[in-house]
């Protein structure tokens, strides 16, 4: 062993007595690869592991807890220890956990013992994960102990299902064949947990449903009980699909209970869908659900219907999202049909039955239970959209029309009841999240925009409405007025002081969670980028974004990222009115800055643009060479190099800039007209000098402007232009014919000599 690490013999001396900081430091040092040497097995490593095994056999809970952590770290980072002592550690951990859980439910458990049991379960789970996948270790250390570990975990699941069920779920998926003898005990455990399902925490409920779904992996594929169907091909997901249909078949009887309260027959489409739901199918693997008791004389029992539908939805979600070793066939049509039926159960369009009494307790229970029933349809669609995605495109019209049924409406009206929206805040936010999920597959063309527009108004109202104190104010003042003078003091003594409601009403407001802002901002981003919203909704989103961005900046000192993204979207997609909030957005983000706003405020063209250059012809190359030589002439040369008929003054900087322009700018060919080509052929000197004409409007300036000479043939061959750097040319007036006393046709030739007008400078 190297001298840079502490010898294991030193740890052995302080292993039982160390605690606190010493123990944490020892754990960190044991992760060093310096201890992963096979030479240490003969002396130090064997002595150290013997001490760890002694800690795990101890009757002291704290010593067992320390042994669990040392075994976890040492086996994770030291493969030598895992291969040498993995099987022995598995046996000791199993026996320690069995002793700790044998009388776990009968005796009073202290917090210290619960922590020790939790450490034993976590260590056993980690050790099995480390051994799994290694052929020799799995065969020698893991498989022999599974037959004893599985029943022990199932028995412990009755006391601590949140600890044992995650391990059982993993064993079901990884060792389904080894688990087959214990399926009956696990099914009995899950049936007991289903009996008090609503008393479990959400995480445990999710694990219970996942474990029930994985039970279908233990059945042998291709085991067809019907001998007449034995010749058909069997699929690997046959039992998985049967379990899913077994759960779907239980929706029908529960939904039909609402048929005793609501007049479902008034909606022919809903009644037809309800009749086509899957019927009850026998499945021996699925755990049994307890009987559902509903008494209309006890209106509160109507909530049991929503609770059972929530449990069934959790079970269906497990079948959809859990990974399997084989592809699964999901019945999309049946799942969409179930969600559509659940969302259609609303008093907005379905009246109560005529023979039903209308007392406040019954109607109130019905109106509170129906939204929870609809919410399960939203959850089911959300799960399908997240895990199946674009396969739902063919069902989108039915899905969108069903989603709109969840929005509460006023009685016998089509306007939104915003007061009910406050009570259904959680469900409406889940509806918005569902819209965000399916919008990724909808695209930009949506025929019906009513749902999108309604959600914009509802989200803005939910976020802005904190708590309704107006009713408290009105009821307090009305009660005080009703009380007489003598009774007013007695009323105040009973009710207490109500002055804080009037003097500090903001102290009674509940803050909106940031998760709600995230859902709303995501929906607004999606709506602005995908669809053209009306001006009213566009202005409402803009006002909401500016107000809360400024509010968060003042209270928290920063603007959340979702609001920054919404500001960018509003600037880039201004809507139909085309008004821009760019100055306001830049002011809000002036401290942190934003790359999008920086580009909009300071646009910059890309440098060294790459274009296509065409190889010039021989005549064009000679012309370009002569022009380059002319522009590259030194500044101290006489003006004799210029034409005698025209005096052009060129500054030194102009010539230098012209040469640099020829080197850096992208050259493009200039096509000349037939007349210019003829003139250049006959009078090359005159053609070269005529391109340099002094600009009278810019005399005295140091630099001349660079322009491109265009011809009528530019449109024919635009990619093959060439660019020359020349001085700016002013329009030349039309030439006045000179009368030389000879007729114009004396020459008899077809060529016409151009007439040159001398400038005033030449005359002088």
From Swiss-Prot:
One GO MF term: chromatin binding
Annotated Polar residues bias: 670-680
TM annotation in the entry: none
Subcellular location as annotated: Nucleus
Main location: nucleus
Protein keywords: Nucleus, Ribosome biogenesis, rRNA processing
Composition skew (Acidic residues), residue ranges: 619-643, 741-764
Compositional bias ranges of the Low complexity kind: 725-738
Gene Ontology cellular-component terms listed: cytosol; nucleoplasm; nucleus; rixosome complex
Subunit structure: Component of the RIX1 complex, composed of IPI1, RIX1/IPI2 and IPI3 in a 1:2:2 stoichiometry. The complex interacts (via RIX1) with MDN1 (via its hexameric AAA ATPase ring) and the pre-60S ribosome particles.
Protein name: Pre-rRNA-processing protein RIX1
Taxonomic path: Eukaryota, Fungi, Dikarya, Ascomycota, Saccharomycotina
